């Protein structure tokens, strides 16, 4: 296959020309403008310290439609227990560093290298990268970061990047809060990028690249919810009378 080498121009090749593994292009930079252009075209960076910047558009693509989120009964009980507090965009840097430090089965290092951390911090400052923080009580009256996730939001799409947990179910709690908030705000799709058993259990599914790009085109017509996110007053992720009974 021919691997497209990016130039200084903010342009990418057609995602449909990616390799069977999803690899599309090499090089370029991680500027805010290039990253936004990439995500708007269904492309994301993924590499490590031993390689140049690599750009991917896998086929199939793992996505989660917010209305199809499945919350197991045990996780519902965990959320209702009140042992966790959830916030948005209050500790983005701590979340991305925790994701970088998290041990991954079958991986000896991390793809969230320093260059990536700096780039997504810039995206966060630009108001398009967001974090979900899950806190548990620490010693005394303090609290500790128990889990969380971060990703990029454009139009009606949230592109999930990474998550971590230090307490049982903390990352799962972050997923539920995020997806229910996205549904509340009218988002169309969560891009999970790579297929994982973890996300399939939440109701994610695989779709073809072509299907994803069509969905992306529609979703990006929605207005951008830029800036720091906040949880609406009174919002509760499980208090949705219109949702089907997920205990069945």
From Swiss-Prot:
Main location: cytoplasm
Cellular compartments per GO CC: cytoplasm
SUPFAM superfamilies: Acyl-CoA N-acyltransferases (Nat)
Enzyme Commission number(s) from the entry: 2.3.2.6
KW Zinc-finger (keyword) present: no
Location of the protein in the cell: Cytoplasm
Similarity-based family: Belongs to the L/F-transferase family.
Role summary: Functions in the N-end rule pathway of protein degradation where it conjugates Leu, Phe and, less efficiently, Met from aminoacyl-tRNAs to the N-termini of proteins containing an N-terminal arginine or lysine.
This protein's name: Leucyl/phenylalanyl-tRNA--protein transferase
Gene source species: Oleidesulfovibrio alaskensis (strain ATCC BAA-1058 / DSM 17464 / G20) (Desulfovibrio alaskensis)
């Amino acid at each position: 296959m021919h691997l497209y080498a990016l130039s200084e121009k903010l342009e990418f090749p057609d995602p449909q020309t990616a390799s069977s593994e999803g690899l599309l292009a090499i090089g370029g930079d991680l500027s805010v403008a290039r990253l936004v252009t990439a995500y708007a075209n269904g492309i994301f960076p993924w590499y490590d310290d031993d390689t140049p910047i690599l750009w991917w558009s896998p086929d199939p693509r793992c996505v989660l439609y917010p209305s199809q989120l499945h919350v197991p009964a045990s996780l519902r009980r965990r959320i209702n227990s009140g042992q966790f507090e959830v916030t948005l965009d209050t500790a983005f840097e701590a979340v991305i560093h925790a994701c970088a430090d998290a041990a991954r089965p079958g991986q000896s290092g991390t793809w969230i290298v320093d260059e990536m951390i700096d780039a997504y911090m810039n995206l966060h400052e630009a108001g398009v990268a967001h974090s979900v923080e899950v806190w548990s009580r620490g010693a005394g009256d303090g609290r500790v970061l128990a889990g969380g996730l971060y990703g990029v939001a454009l139009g009606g799409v949230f592109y999930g990047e990474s998550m971590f947990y230090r307490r049982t179910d903390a990352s799962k709690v972050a997923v539920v809060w995020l997806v229910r908030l996205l549904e509340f705000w009218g988002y169309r799709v969560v891009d999970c990028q790579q297929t994982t058993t973890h996300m399939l259990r939440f109701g994610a599914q695989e779709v073809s690249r072509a299907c994803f790009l069509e969905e992306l085109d529609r979703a990006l017509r929605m207005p951008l919810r830029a800036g720091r996110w906040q949880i609406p007053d009174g919002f509760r992720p499980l208090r949705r009378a219109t949702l089907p009974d997920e205990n069945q």
